[in-house]
């Protein structure tokens, strides 16, 4: 596993987000509720996971969407 991916996974919230996305793509609002973390924290960690290449935006969604959807790469 590349070092950048390993760094992306060290945080418990990031690990939880990845766990939730393994079964299906999900919207950020769902991840906030399911992870039990504040919206800003989930948004921050989703951006970090996108930059590391662990997750990506679902087609038709993106950073400017009101409620972006993500999937595991």
Give, region by region, the residue ranges found by the protein language model.
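Key DNA-contact positions within bacterial/archaeal DNA-binding proteins
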Residues: 40
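Glycine-centered, phosphate/nucleic-acid-interacting loop/turn motifs that mediate DNA/RNA or nucleotide
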Residues: 53, 59
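Short acidic, hydrophobic short linear motifs in intrinsically disordered regions
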Residues: 26-34
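Short alpha-helical segments that sit at the start of domains
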Residues: 1-16
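Short, hydrophobic-biased segments on the C-terminal half of alpha helices
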Residues: 46-47
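Alpha-helical residues within the helix-turn-helix
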Residues: 33, 50-51
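Short capping segments at the starts of secondary-structure elements
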Residues: 12, 23-27
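Short beta-strand "wing" residues that participate in macromolecule-binding interfaces
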Residues: 57, 72
């Amino acid at each position: 596993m590349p070092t950048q991916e390993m760094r992306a996974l060290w945080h418990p919230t990031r690990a939880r987000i990845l766990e939730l996305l393994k079964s299906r793509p999900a919207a950020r609002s769902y991840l906030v509720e399911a992870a039990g973390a504040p919206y800003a924290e989930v948004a921050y960690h989703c951006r970090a996971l996108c930059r590391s290449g662990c997750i990506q935006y679902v087609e038709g969604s993106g950073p400017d969407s009101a409620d972006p959807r993500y999937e595991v790469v």
